[in-house]
């Protein structure tokens, strides 16, 4: 057994983020978000968009826009942005390569916990055919007081799934998500297989947060879980 499983408790639950982990949605989401921001009168490039907004809830994003950029999108703009995004998801959203096979082979229970609203998570899973793997084990930042990088969402998911935090493994693609998992006292595997996460700079940023490990291919995950379980 390698260092990742030599001393840790065996995993009792895997908590997947959704965007950029289960579905390759981040480039689509960023396209719509930055377009909406441009309509409001500010230009933010893609790199800055990912740095500022990746992995954060809509409530957190709108607060960042107010405090850092002086932009108040307003409810009408937010509703229009959501409509555009959902239409784009229905046309273009794809699952992360290999994720269906990975979920089918997982040796431990799992759920999804995302900064997105519940409606969006369900749409993402429906469009990509992943919904049956999760059933009702879907948790949204709208269910807790604070979104990522606060630990609330992951702790809520663990409580609902009746697993202690130190037996949870979080799969995350964003710095905010990695920070949230660590704050929840959970192990976290940083995933870099999404199309938005290919740059060395993104991987380096995740590594500075010291996740349990960084991995690129979803097909490796069931084996990592078996290794941690000692099988």
What do these predicted regions represent?
Residues 36-37, 57-72, 124, 158, ...:
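Helix-loop "lid/cap" segments that line or gate small-molecule binding pockets
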Residues 30, 34, 58-63, 78, ...:
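An amphipathic alpha-helix signature
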Residues 28, 53-57, 80, 94-98, ...:
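Short beta->alpha linker loops
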Residues 2-51, 68:
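Active-site neighborhood of HAD-like aspartate-dependent phosphohydrolases
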Residues 4, 10, 87-112, 118-122:
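Short, acidic loop-to-helix structural element flanking the phosphoryl-transfer center
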Residues 39-43, 69-72, 129-133, 162-163:
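Short helix-capping segments at alpha-helix termini
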Residues 43, 63-101:
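Metal-dependent phosphoesterase signature
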Residues 1-12, 104, 117-231:
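Asp-based, Mg2+/Mn2+-dependent phosphohydrolase catalytic module
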């Amino acid at each position: 057994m390698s260092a990742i499983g030599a001393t840790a408790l065996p995993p009792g639950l895997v908590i997947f983020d959704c965007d950029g982990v289960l579905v390759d949605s981040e480039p689509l989401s960023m396209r719509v978000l930055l377009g909406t921001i441009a309509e409001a009168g500010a230009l933010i490039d893609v790199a800055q968009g990912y740095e500022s907004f990746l992995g954060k809830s809509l409530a957190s994003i709108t607060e960042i826009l107010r405090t850092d950029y002086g932009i108040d999108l307003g409810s009408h703009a937010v509703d229009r942005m959501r409509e555009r995004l959902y239409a784009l998801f229905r046309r273009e959203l794809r699952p992360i390569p290999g994720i269906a096979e990975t979920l089918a082979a997982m040796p431990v229970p799992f759920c999804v916990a995302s900064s997105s609203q519940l409606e969006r998570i369900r749409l993402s899973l429906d469009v990509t055919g992943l919904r049956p793997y999760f059933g009702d084990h879907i948790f949204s930042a709208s269910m807790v007081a604070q979104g990522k990088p606060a630990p609330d969402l992951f702790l809520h998911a663990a409580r609902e799934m009746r697993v202690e935090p130190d037996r949870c493994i979080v799969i995350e693609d964003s710095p905010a998500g990695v920070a949230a998992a660590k704050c929840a006292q959970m192990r976290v595997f940083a995933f870099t297989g999404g199309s938005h996460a290919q740059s060395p700079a993104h991987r380096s940023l995740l590594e500075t947060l010291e996740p349990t490990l960084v991995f690129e291919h979803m097909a490796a995950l069931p084996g990592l879980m078996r290794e941690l379980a000692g099988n």
